[in-house]
């Protein structure tokens, strides 16, 4: 079933709630949009973006609760970026940054919750032509932060 914008916006807001306190609100978009992009390309599996082995959102889901989740998320994003000539584009947010995401169990819990939020979304369902999910998400975040 196609995702409703209200469901997308609710998930975006929920993910921002998880990030509160560790960083300036203007930086939320870096993390939220990166995860949304990873989820989107993993769900869509179209020919424009290659999702390499070890570079999918499902690989992130498998990390929930892992002590090294931040570093491993960075590596997963790096694999997708490298496979698609997107280095320096989608790999800017550091998911292992203790000053922004906390350390130890705090980081582990925060990132596990973030991944779980996006895991609930089905972005692969058919939508009407011209529906720009990523653009809508970006505009939503810009309006609120």
Description of each model-found segment:
Residues 1-145:
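Non-catalytic, mostly N-terminal accessory regions of nucleic-acid modification and defense proteins
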């Amino acid at each position: 079933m196609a995702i409703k914008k209200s469901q997308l916006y609710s998930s975006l807001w929920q993910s921002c709630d998880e990030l509160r306190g560790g960083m300036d609100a203007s930086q939320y978009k870096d993390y939220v949009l990166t995860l949304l992009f990873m989820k989107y390309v993993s769900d869509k599996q179209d020919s424009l973006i290659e999702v390499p082995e070890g570079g999918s959102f499902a690989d992130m889901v498998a990390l929930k609760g892992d002590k090294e989740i931040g570093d491993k998320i960075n590596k997963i994003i790096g694999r997708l970026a490298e496979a698609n000539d997107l280095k320096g584009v989608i790999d800017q947010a550091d998911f292992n940054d203790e000053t922004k995401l906390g350390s130890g169990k705090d980081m582990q819990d925060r990132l596990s919750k973030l991944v779980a939020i996006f895991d609930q979304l089905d972005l692969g369902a058919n939508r009407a032509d011209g529906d720009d999910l990523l653009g809508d998400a970006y505009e939503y975040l810009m309006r609120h932060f």
